[in-house]
Amino acid sequence: MSPPKPFLAALALFFLAGGASPLYSRPAGDRPDTPPTVQPAAESAEPAELRELPPPEIRTPLAVLPEGPRPGEPLTVGYHVPDTAANTGLRASLIGAQGRRLSRSSFFDIPGDAGGPKIKAAILAVPSTAAPGAALVRVENASGQALAELSLVIADRNFAAEEIPLNQANTNLRTVPDPRKTAESEYLTAILYRTGNDIHTLGPFVPPVMSARRTSFFGDRRVYRYADGSSGTSIHAGVDYGVPTGTAVTACADGRVVLARPRIVTGNSVVLEHLPGVYSIYYHLDKILVEEGAFINAGAVLGESGSTGLATGPHLHWEIRVAGENADPDAFTARPVLDKEALLRKMSE
């Protein structure tokens, strides 16, 4: 028997009005026209490396890296400056046996976050002649008053010896007095003992030539045999690379050219400033290709190697000075010269 007509009419009106099918009832949350309900997600943990960490707690105001330096190696001194006005003119000194000062340098500001600890740094070099044993680093104010001290031990180190015969021309370069040599020496010395505030690089440095052949090493104890049979001694201040004339010589790090000119003893010479009191030197060049005052990027060509000045053959003499003191170039290629994070870790131990 067919359903009554009034029932069918009512059923049609129900579907036209959007009513649910009598055969299937879709859950309300599954309706296409109903937006899904989004439950609030649990707060996710931010990766530790992305969180803003608080500044480290300073437990000791003075830190020195490395802890057991060898003769010829640089020392980076970090000092947490007290919140006082008496923090200008600070200097760091390396004191050896019998209280003898081995080297000294001025502090400079290390750039950092505005809310972080205020750290100053000074870079020293352990002289190649320093005796092994107990030593200390002392922080002094402008009046010479000691503000902080830290003990350390200078490690032992052996240096090679070499004998170099000189012809008459090179003998004269070393032994005959010349006011021009004196003036050139005084001019360069004034530059190398100057400590400014410019930080051009943090290091590490890179060698200035693509050659592994070395003819002399840092700290070599030299004996010069002069043409008349007499002799003289010196300590080699850098590294000599046995490269042919015309080899490209490049900057070991970013820096500013503070000297680019011929000199009597060292021939065509270039000097770069990299950090306050830290300089690299390039001697005996055949050509100079930079000008004084220019800013140079690491790897830029400074000139070409040669044999100008007091040289027994073509080579490049590469030297590093720290507050006027000779320093081993290899130490500067091994690690950064200025590492604020390492200093802060040391201060927080």
Model-derived features: where do they sit?
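Bacterial N-terminal signal peptides
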Residues: 9-18
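Cationic-aromatic interfacial patches
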Residues: 24-159
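Surface-exposed, glycine-biased beta-strand/turn segments
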Residues: 152-266
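Acidic, glycine-rich catalytic/binding loops that coordinate metals and/or anionic ligands
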Residues: 159-193, 200-201, 291-300, 319-349
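Flexible, gly/ser-rich surface segments that form the specificity/activation loops bordering the active-site cleft
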Residues: 218, 258-264, 300-314
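Short, well-structured beta-strand-loop connectors
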Residues: 248-258, 289-305
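Zn2+-dependent peptidoglycan hydrolase active-site motif and core
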Residues: 252-289, 314, 319
